[in-house]
Amino acid sequence: MIQQESRLKVADNSGARELLVIKVLGGSRVKFGYIGDIIVATVKQATPGGVVKKGDVVKAVVVRTKQGAHRADGSYIKFDENAAVLIKDDKSPQGTRIFGPVARELRDKDYMKIVSLAPEVL
């Protein structure tokens, strides 16, 4: 469950290390973001020489949450951290590598490029 002011780790090599959520996209009544949701965030920590800098406002998709997700077959998946991947306007990732596992729900929400770059899909 990601909400305004939540801090997320960045799971790609775009240069950002930590994000602060400004807004969860999807309408005025959407308060919480889950796996596969798009967020608008600002970069709080960045690596030197990266594509994005500290203070940049970016869009990202949530790939891991501590709260987890219920699946149609009755199973439940949760991760150890909240993480996101920075995306461009056409929903393709800004980085060229994805670190750590991502949830299978991203495939259903049409983020195939992120799923193909990820080392593990759970």
Curated annotation (Swiss-Prot):
InterPro entries per record: Ribosomal_uL14 (IPR000218), Ribosomal_uL14_bac-type (IPR005745), Ribosomal_uL14_CS (IPR019972), Ribosomal_uL14_sf (IPR036853)
Highest taxon of source: Bacteria
Any one of the GO CC terms: cytosolic large ribosomal subunit
GO biological process, one term: translation
Keyword tags: Ribonucleoprotein, Ribosomal protein, RNA-binding, rRNA-binding
A GO molecular-function annotation: large ribosomal subunit rRNA binding
Family that this chain belongs to: Belongs to the universal ribosomal protein uL14 family.
Function description: Binds to 23S rRNA. Forms part of two intersubunit bridges in the 70S ribosome.
Subunit note: Part of the 50S ribosomal subunit. Forms a cluster with proteins L3 and L19. In the 70S ribosome, L14 and L19 interact and together make contacts with the 16S rRNA in bridges B5 and B8.
Protein name: Large ribosomal subunit protein uL14
Gene designation per UniProt: rplN
